[in-house]
Amino acid sequence: MAFKRINKELTDLGRDPPSSCSAGPVGEDLFHWQATIMGPGDSPYSGGVFFLAIHFPTDYPFKPPKVNFTTRIYHPNINSNGSICLDILRDQWSPALTISKVLLSICSMLTDPNPDEPLVPEIAHVYKTDRARYEATAREWTRKYAI
């Protein structure tokens, strides 16, 4: 089941790729993908290229994939290990979701962080209290790690 579904998503991604994102298998392993997200133009991540690792469980799509940033990023919902705090990757996962939809959700999270459910409370605090400093630091990290 998982193999067939992952193959279908790969085909669909090739046919109709989401804007500013791409993803595909690492080598021959269909259960391990690498994804690329271009930093949204209307965010402090603009101009950056961010890489993510995607690991599909054997019972996909009934369990969510594990998705991690491998590029460092300054964001309240993404920690230094690249873990992402996103409800659809946890309790709000549904088998109707696809990697394409997950990547688009991550893109929109880059534009609109959720400081009320932070993975990094310090960054969320800066986001809420000093937006200019948050954006300057996010731009600096983007230049340093993603360009």
From Swiss-Prot:
InterPro entries cross-referenced by the UniProt entry: UBQ-conjugat_E2_core (IPR000608), UBQ-conjugating_AS (IPR023313), UBQ-conjugating_enzyme/RWD (IPR016135)
Source organism of the structure: Colletotrichum gloeosporioides
Pathway entry: Protein modification; protein ubiquitination
Keyword rRNA processing set for record: no
UniProt induction comment: By hard-surface contact. Ethylene and the host surface wax enhance this induction which is essential for appressorium formation.
Pfam families hit by this protein: UQ_con
Alphabetical keyword list: ATP-binding, Nucleotide-binding, Transferase, Ubl conjugation pathway
A Gene Ontology molecular function term of the record: ATP binding
Name this protein carries in UniProt: Ubiquitin-conjugating enzyme E2-16 kDa
GO BP annotation list: protein ubiquitination
Reactions mediated catalytically: S-ubiquitinyl-[E1 ubiquitin-activating enzyme]-L-cysteine + [E2 ubiquitin-conjugating enzyme]-L-cysteine = [E1 ubiquitin-activating enzyme]-L-cysteine + S-ubiquitinyl-[E2 ubiquitin-conjugating enzyme]-L-cysteine
Function: Catalyzes the covalent attachment of ubiquitin to other proteins. May also mediate selective proteolysis pathways.
Family of the protein in this entry: Belongs to the ubiquitin-conjugating enzyme family.
Class of enzymatic activity (EC top level): transferase
Residues at the catalytic site: 107
UBC core domain location: 1-147
EC number annotated for this UniProt entry: 2.3.2.23
